[in-house]
């Protein structure tokens, strides 16, 4: 499938196709009047978010969460969180816990007036086994004793039909006996599988007698060693939906070819009287393809294992634990999802749309502060050594009710190294000998020169305060200047580690085609500096977010930031530095 670049506006233009489907079902009463097994009326729509607990959720999952929980809320329904935990080899409670935390962090709940709607496919193992026997008894499933390699080879391809298994015509009695012996643990892994009997010449290869159960002697994180056979996803998923009274099973496009199998399983069980109508229906929407990122679990695991990142929660990672640590807010992710909308066709969404959503959200909520990230000392020569002038600035320029923050102006300050030059280029309005600038929230100063070490490196800048020019006083505008620089008092500044994060890759599609995604790693995706911060930041708590004026938005690291030893991460810059 071709993937064209798309803006958020373009993607959002088709964002209502799922709503149209739901509206039609509501108008036609498709799921009206339903009750659960306890006789309680069921809501008009029920959706679900069904992750497999074999890894950490990423930004693509956030879109699925937003779609499923958001539509359920919009229509007065409910959304279930269900773990599709049918592969004991790859799944772990660590991932279960992280997924629960991530969904909660995004602001969603699977609880409502009828209780807790957190489910595990493994809780249905006994029922799933019973449904498999129903299919066997109907002649719709059989035990195949071919090896996995033989099954794959005999499935055919898009140009030739599959070859029926030599075991396809086993009797119902033999199939039942073998299946029960499989459950009893009489066979080794791979010795037998249960397959659906559909059509080995079907144009859709998924329908060529897919495997429904396999033998897997492995410890399960919930059921322990109670089972040695496990159902496949395609068999489990649709039945779990039906058991939970799901109405709209919303999946991403890679499951489109699996929809006929979804319907085949449910239709057979309905016709056998094992499941009541109306049955759930599957609908597909485009998954999120974000530029300058990868979401493949295998490739993300490679980054972690090769220590190219600092773990799954590295702020450069697209995992939800990573972007949370980066400082993204749940509201910004929801805003991003709203802007890109829901489409039927795959497309690439530019990272700048996500970053703009984060920027817009933090602009409205983040208190302002000052940080000097590449410091050089500025000495005000015409004031005494004990000079200490109180200055103030609004906590947020658009929210005066938040008050003002106080900080001192002293004789020695820290300023950004880039705010001084001896030989200014055209259009440079900051400090150079003879030039005047305003110290933000303070006085106008005139630069008089600088000090250098033996190697010619600038070690200090010198200037004089121009009296009666303090910001907010009657004489503030008596001296006109074009430059305005930020600063912190050298005596009062808070020293802190600041981690300057950027995009992990330099290529917008780092793993497309035959590219080696490792070749596109951005060497400047993380820089660590020792910075000097406004003293008001001493009280910052983990996950407190701020705008560092002139620099961007920053967050106190949720893991490493400690009282008296703060660590800040750059969330996003004030402007898009990657735009063409």
Curated annotation (Swiss-Prot):
- GO function terms (MF aspect): ATP binding; glutamine-tRNA ligase activity
- Write down the SUPFAM superfamilies for this protein, in alphabetical order: Nucleotidylyl transferase (SSF52374), Ribosomal protein L25-like (SSF50715)
Q: In the record, which residues are listed under signal peptide?
A: none
Per UniProt, which keywords does this protein have? Aminoacyl-tRNA synthetase, ATP-binding, Cytoplasm, Ligase, Nucleotide-binding, Protein biosynthesis
EC number(s) per entry: 6.1.1.18
**Placement of sequence motif 'HIGH' region:** 51-61
Give residue numbers for sequence motif 'KMSKS' region. 294-298
Where in or outside the cell is it found? Cytoplasm
Do you know which InterPro entries this protein is assigned to?
aa-tRNA-synth_I_CS, Gln-tRNA-synth, Gln/Glu-tRNA_Ligase, Gln_tRNA_ligase_bac, Glu/Gln-tRNA-synth, Glu/Gln-tRNA-synth_Ib_cat-dom, Glu/Gln-tRNA-synth_Ib_codon-bd, Glu_tRNA_lig_a-bdl
The residues that the entry says bind ATP are 52-54, 58-64, 252, 287-288
| Domain of life of the organism encoding this protein | Bacteria
- Catalysed reactions listed for this entry: tRNA(Gln) + L-glutamine + ATP = L-glutaminyl-tRNA(Gln) + AMP + diphosphate
Signal found in the keyword field? no
Pfam family example for this protein? tRNA-synt_1c
UniProt-listed GO biological process terms:
glutaminyl-tRNA aminoacylation; glutamyl-tRNA aminoacylation
**CDD domains (alphabetical):** GlnRS_core
The cellular component terms of Gene Ontology attached to this UniProt record, alphabetical and capped at eight, are: cytosol
Residues annotated as binding L-glutamine are 84, 233
Q: How does it assemble?
A: Monomer.
What NCBIfam families does the record point to?
A: glnS, PRK14703.1
Q: Report the family membership.
A: Belongs to the class-I aminoacyl-tRNA synthetase family.
What is the name listed in the Swiss-Prot or TrEMBL entry for this protein? Glutamine--tRNA ligase
**Could you tell me the gene encoding this protein?**
glnS
């Amino acid at each position: 499938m071709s993937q064209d670049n798309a803006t958020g506006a373009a993607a959002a233009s088709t964002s209502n196709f799922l709503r149209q489907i739901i509206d039609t079902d509501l108008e036609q009463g498709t799921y009206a009047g339903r009750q659960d097994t306890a006789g309680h009326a069921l809501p008009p729509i029920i959706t679900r978010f069904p992750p497999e607990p074999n890894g950490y959720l990423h930004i693509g999952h956030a879109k699925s969460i937003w779609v499923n929980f958001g539509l359920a809320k919009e229509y007065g329904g409910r959304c279930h969180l269900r773990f599709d935990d049918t592969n004991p080899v790859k799944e772990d409670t660590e991932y279960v816990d992280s997924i629960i935390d991530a969904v909660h962090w995004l602001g969603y709940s699977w609880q409502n007036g009828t209780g807790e709607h957190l489910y595990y496919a493994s809780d249905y193992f006994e029922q799933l086994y019973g449904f498999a026997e129903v299919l066997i008894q109907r002649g719709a499933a059989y035990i195949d004793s071919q090896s996995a390699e033989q099954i794959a080879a005999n499935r055919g391809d898009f140009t030739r039909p599959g070859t029926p298994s030599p075991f396809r015509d086993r009797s119902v009695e033999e199939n039942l006996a073998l299946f029960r012996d499989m459950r009893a643990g009489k066979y080794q892994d791979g010795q037998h599988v249960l397959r659906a009997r559909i059509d080995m010449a079907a144009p859709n290869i998924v329908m060529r007698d897919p495997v429904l159960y396999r033998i897997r002697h492995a410890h399960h994180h919930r059921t322990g060693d109670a089972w040695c056979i496990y159902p496949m996803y395609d068999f489990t998923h649709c039945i779990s939906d039906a058991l939970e009274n799901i109405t709209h099973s919303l999946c991403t496009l890679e499951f489109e070819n699996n929809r006929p199998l979804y319907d085949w399983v449910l239709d057979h069980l309905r016709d056998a009287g094992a499941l009541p109508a109306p049955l759930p229906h599957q609908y597909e929407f485009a998954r999120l393809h974000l530029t300058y990122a990868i979401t493949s679990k295998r490739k993300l695991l490679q980054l972690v294992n090769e220590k190219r990142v600092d773990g799954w929660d590295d702020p450069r990672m697209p995992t939800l634990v990573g972007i949370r640590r980066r400082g993204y807010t749940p509201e910004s992710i929801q805003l991003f999802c709203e802007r890109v909308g829901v489409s039927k066709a795959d497309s690439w969404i530019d990272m700048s749309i996500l970053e703009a959503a984060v920027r817009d959200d933090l602009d409205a909520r983040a208190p302002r502060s000052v940080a000097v990230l590449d410091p050089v000392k500025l000495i005000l020569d015409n004031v005494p050594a004990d000079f200490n002038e109180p200055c103030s600035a609004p906590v947020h320029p658009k929210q005066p009710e938040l008050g003002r923050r106080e900080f001192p102006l002293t004789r020695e300050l820290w300023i950004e190294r880039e705010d001084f030059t001896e030989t200014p280029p055209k259009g440079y309005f900051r400090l150079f000998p003879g030039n005047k600038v305003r110290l933000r929230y303070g006085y106008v100063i005139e630069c008089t020169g600088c000090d250098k070490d033996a190697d010619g490196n600038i070690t200090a800048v010198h200037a004089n305060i121009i009296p009666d020019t303090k910001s907010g006083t009657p004489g503030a505008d008596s001296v006109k200047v074009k430059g305005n620089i930020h600063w912190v008092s050298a005596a009062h500044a808070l020293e802190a580690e600041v981690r300057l994060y950027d995009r992990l890759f330099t290529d917008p599609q780092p793993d497309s085609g035959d590219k080696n995604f490792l070749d596109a790693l951005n060497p400047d995706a993380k820089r660590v500096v020792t910075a000097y911060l406004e003293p008001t930041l001493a009280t910052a708590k983990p996950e407190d977010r701020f705008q560092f004026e002139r620099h961007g938005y920053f967050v106190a690291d949720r893991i490493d930031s400690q009282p008296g030893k703060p660590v800040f991460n750059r969330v996003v810059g004030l402007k898009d530095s990657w735009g063409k």
